[in-house]
């Protein structure tokens, strides 16, 4: 697994400027603001997909993979408009489509800025990628009915980059039909949130529902590592407020599915 490119509080570093010190709630809101535009893009893909599949169902037939081509103009526009987003699309639940067992209608932005499709062999007879249902970016929205942040992980499926995936479930008529999602390169996410974390007077890390560290200024807890002990999914599902686990303060990031973890001072 690739290592984080993130910064950490260096040993012996000067204390943060008191005039710039933020509290955990303020940092959580800043992190939320960083990711809300990405989640807005995911929500738009979810709405487009639900409308498309509802219309297909109204014709009395099951949808085909070719029907999902109607999502492409919106996906291309979101990739062009969102600097943080490196890839976006819809991942169909197995068995949803009449002509293929699995499908990703997925587009990504290349290094030169061009938008291109992800072409995968999803034939279960000879593809290691045919069952994507166990990956957190798919499983968490399916299990919880809520949006999720998965990773960071090396995205062998799409880019071979260390990435986060933000996703949300898509339902049609009360039935789960797949997830809408967007990828964010970890290096871009860290560039956006590490300056905010560094405004805290203590080392801190952002942790997802599975306990995976998404960004950190704590040299003892690097991005990609697991924080064991707290039930972060329960923290995210609880009413807003600061939670405690031993000497750790756990602050949900204002509606975004990440928890800010800081030590007790």
Describe each PLM feature range.
Residues 2-66, 161-163:
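Juxtamembrane extracytoplasmic/periplasmic/luminal helical "stalk" adjacent to the first N-terminal
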Residues 28, 39, 43, 64-79, ...:
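Short amphipathic alpha-helical segments
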Residues 84-144, 215-220:
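Extracellular/periplasmic ligand-sensing ectodomains of membrane signal-transduction proteins
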Residues 95-96, 173, 204-214, 219:
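Short, glycine-anchored, charge-dense loop/turn motifs used at functional sites
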Residues 133-158, 186-197:
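Short, basic/aromatic recognition patches
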Residues 159-193, 260-265:
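Conserved beta-strands of PAS-like sensory domains
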Residues 184-214:
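Solvent-exposed, extracytoplasmic
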Residues 221, 228-265:
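Extracellular/periplasmic juxtamembrane segments that couple receptor/chemosensory ectodomains to their
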């Amino acid at each position: 697994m690739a290592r984080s490119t993130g910064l950490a509080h260096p040993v012996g570093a000067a204390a943060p400027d008191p005039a710039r010190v933020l509290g955990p709630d303020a940092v959580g809101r800043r992190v939320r603001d960083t990711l809300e535009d990405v989640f807005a893009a995911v929500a738009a893909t979810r709405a487009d997909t639900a409308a498309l599949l509802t219309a297909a169902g109204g014709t009395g037939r099951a949808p085909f993979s070719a029907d999902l081509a109607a999502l492409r103009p919106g996906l291309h526009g979101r990739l062009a408009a969102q600097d943080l987003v490196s890839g976006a699309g819809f991942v169909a639940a197995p068995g949803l489509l009449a002509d293929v067992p699995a499908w990703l209608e997925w587009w990504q932005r290349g290094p030169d800025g061009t938008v291109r499709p992800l072409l995968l062999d999803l034939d279960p007879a000879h593809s290691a990628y045919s069952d994507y249902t166990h990956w957190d970016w798919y499983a968490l929205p399916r299990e919880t009915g809520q949006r999720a942040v998965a990773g960071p992980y090396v995205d062998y499926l799409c880019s071979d980059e260390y990435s986060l995936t933000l996703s949300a479930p898509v339902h049609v008529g009360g039935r789960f039909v797949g997830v809408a999602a967007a990828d964010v390169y970890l290096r871009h996410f860290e560039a956006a949130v590490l300056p905010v974390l560094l405004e805290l007077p203590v080392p801190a890390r952002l942790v997802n529902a599975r306990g995976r560290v998404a960004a950190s200024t704590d040299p003892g807890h690097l991005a990609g590592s697991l924080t064991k002990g707290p039930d972060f999914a329960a923290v995210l599902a609880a009413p807003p407020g600061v939670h405690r686990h031993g000497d750790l303060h756990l602050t949900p990031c204002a509606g975004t599915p990440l928890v800010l973890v800081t030590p007790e001072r």
